[in-house]
Amino acid sequence: MYKRQLLACALIPIWYKSLAVGDGAGQISSDRATAYYAVAIAVMTVVSALIGPVCGAIADHMRIKKAIFSTTVVVGVSACILNGFTLTWVLFLVIYVLTKIFYNASLVFYDSMLVDVTTKDRMDEVSSYGYAWGYLGSCVPFLVSLAAYICGPDMLGYISNRLSMIIGFAVTGIWWFVVTIPLFKSYKQVNYVSDAADKDIHKNFENDAFIRDNIKEKNKTNKNPGVLRLIADAFAQIFGTIKKIATKDKKVGLFLVAFFLYIDGVGTIIDNCINIGTDLKLDSVGQVVFLLFTQIVACIGSLIFGRLSQTYKTTTLLYVCIAGYFAVCLYALTLHDLIGFGIMAFGVGCFQGSLQALSRSYFSKII
C-alpha cells in the first residue's frame, strides 16, 4: 500500500505555514502555528490509538475486513483531496487530521492482511518488501506535486501556489486509490473469527491446503453479524484480549507498550521534521530534496533489513533500528544548517521503513 508520508512531511507543513502565519485576520505567529500543528498530530495519534483496537477486532471477522478497509481508503482519499480546497488553517488542520485518522485506520486493516498473504517464516521479508516498494512508489505523486508547486508558477504562469496544492492533494489521493485497486481485487481473507463468543481464530494455516479449504467452506456457510453485534463483539474481543495479555501473553503486552512509545517517536519525527527546518530558516526546497532522498534510502534500508531477517533474529534487528533512530534524535539536537538536515534525513531513511516493517511482521508472528 502506497505511503503518503512524503507529501505530509514536505509540502503540507509548508502550505500550512503559509495559511497560518502572518498578520492577516485569524493568522498567528510561526511558533504558535508549529505548536498547534503538533497538537493536531497528537489528537490524531490519540484518536487513532483509541479506534485502532476496535478496527483490529472488527478485522478479525470473516468477509468484513476487505469491505471496511475499502471504506476507510475511499473516505481517506476523499478527505485527502479536500485538503487542497481549504481556505483557513483551522479548517485545513481539521480535514488533515480526519485524513490521517482514516489513513491510519486503513493501515490497521492493511497490516492485518499480512497473516493472510504469506507464511510465518516469510513475514519479515514480505513486510519489508511492502514498505520498501511503498516508500519508492510514494516518490511518483510527490514529484508531480513538487513540480507543480515549484515550477508551475514560473513555467506556466497561471498555476498559483494554491492551485499547485490542489493538484498535489488530488494526485496524491488518486494515486493512493489507484495503487490500492490490486489489493481490492486480489485479497482474500483466510484468518477470521467465525464466532466472537468462542474466539475461534483460524490463523495457523501455514501451507496446509486442507485447513485453507475448510476455512473457505466455512466462509460460504456463515453469515456476517449485524453492525451492532459486530461492534459489541469487537469490544468483547478487546477486553478478552487485554485479559489474556495481562495473564498469559505478557510478551505481547510488553511489545505493545514498547511499540506505542517508539513508534510515536517515529511519527513525531516524520510529521514535524519540515516544521523544525522551517523554524530554523533552512531552505525549503533543499529540505524537500533531502526528504525525497530519505524515501529512496528507506526503500533500500527496508530491503536490506528484510534480507538480514533471514539470518538474524527479528528482535535483534528491532533493537538496532531503535538504537539508530535514538542516535538520529540526539544528532538532531545539534541541527543548525541544511547539510546537517541532510545527514539527519539519511539517518532517518536508514531505519524508518525497516523499523515499521519489522515491527509489523514481529507482532504478526507473536500473536
Positions of PLM-derived features:
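Helix-to-loop junctions at the C-terminal end of transmembrane segments
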Residues: L50-R63, I300-K313
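Juxtamembrane intracellular "pre-TM" segments in multi-pass secondary transporters
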Residues: Q189-L256
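Structural signature of the two symmetry-related core transmembrane helices
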Residues: A67-L82, T316-Y331
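Intracellular juxtamembrane helix-capping segments at the cytosolic ends
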Residues: A105-T119, S354-I367
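Helix-loop boundary and gating motifs at the non-cytosolic
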Residues: K3-T45, K251-A258, Y262-D283, Q287-F290
